[in-house]
Amino acid sequence: MDTVAPLLPLLADRLEPLRRRLCNRYGMDRLEVFGSAAKGLFDPVRSDLDFIVQMTGQREPGYARRFCSFADELAALLGRPVDLLTESMIRNPYFRKDVDATRRLLLEL
């Protein structure tokens, strides 16, 4: 798995604000990008951004609210629609194979 460096200026320019504003607030431990942005096929007009997040406290009350709020704020910060998944949401083996082939680490705390 490669770390994102020149992946997408949109992401690279916002990594530090993302870490400061969102990661600590929502208990995010790890954030990866996959799909068109990770493959270099990102279309600035039509593409959304696909992420896999690992957050603390998945069994704690309020986790679903934190997850949804994180997704909303991530979209606002990036100015694009986002699809946010966790590892446990990726159950289809064909989808898993595609995700695993393209995923790139953005942040790990």
Question: Residue ranges of each PLM-predicted region?
Answer:
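Catalytic core of pol beta-like nucleotidyltransferases
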Residues: M1-E32, A38-V45, T56-L109
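Short, aliphatic-rich beta-strand segments
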Residues: D50-V53
